[in-house]
């Protein structure tokens, strides 16, 4: 009986901490971005070229440079000389940002159903922004 209450307190504290960490990772730090304020680029011949897009949905978090995610439809073709990106690795985003499915994008990149291009190099040291382009 003497150890039950402290054990119960420890278990409840662990569950509360786990819920807090989960919430912070899924919802706490992310912000939806205004589509008008999102600048989409692709590197072509060593220079960033702006991309025109519609249906832009984007999220970001101040806590990490790798939390930026966006889904969009290009309104035109990629510019001549767009730089392909070798070995892209889509990172999993929050579940509620349903337009971005990292697993599907990874599968499509590996199968050739989508192509990866360098969007913006060195957003932060060793962090590149990459876009996956589908043929449609």
In which residue ranges do the predicted regions lie?
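N-terminal export/targeting and maturation segments
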Residues: 4-81
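Aromatic- and glycine-enriched beta-alpha-beta binding-site module
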Residues: 35, 132-134
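Mature extracytoplasmic domains of secretory-pathway proteins
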Residues: 57-123
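C-terminal partner/receptor-binding element of secreted or periplasmic proteins
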Residues: 125-128, 135-136
């Amino acid at each position: 009986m003497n150890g039950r209450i402290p054990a119960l307190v420890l278990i409840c504290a662990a569950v509360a901490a786990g819920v807090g960490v989960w919430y912070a990772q899924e919802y706490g730090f992310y912000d939806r971005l205004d589509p008008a304020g999102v600048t989409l680029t692709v590197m072509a011949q060593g220079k960033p070229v702006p991309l025109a897009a519609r249906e832009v949905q984007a999220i970001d978090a101040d806590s990490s440079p790798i939390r930026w995610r966006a889904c969009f439809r290009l309104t035109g073709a990629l510019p001549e000389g767009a730089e392909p990106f070798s070995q892209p690795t889509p990172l999993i985003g929050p579940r509620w940002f349903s337009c971005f499915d990292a697993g599907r994008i990874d599968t499509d990149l590996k199968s050739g159903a989508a192509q990866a291009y360098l969007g913006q190099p060195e957003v932060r040291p060793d962090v590149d922004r990459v876009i996956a382009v589908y043929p449609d």
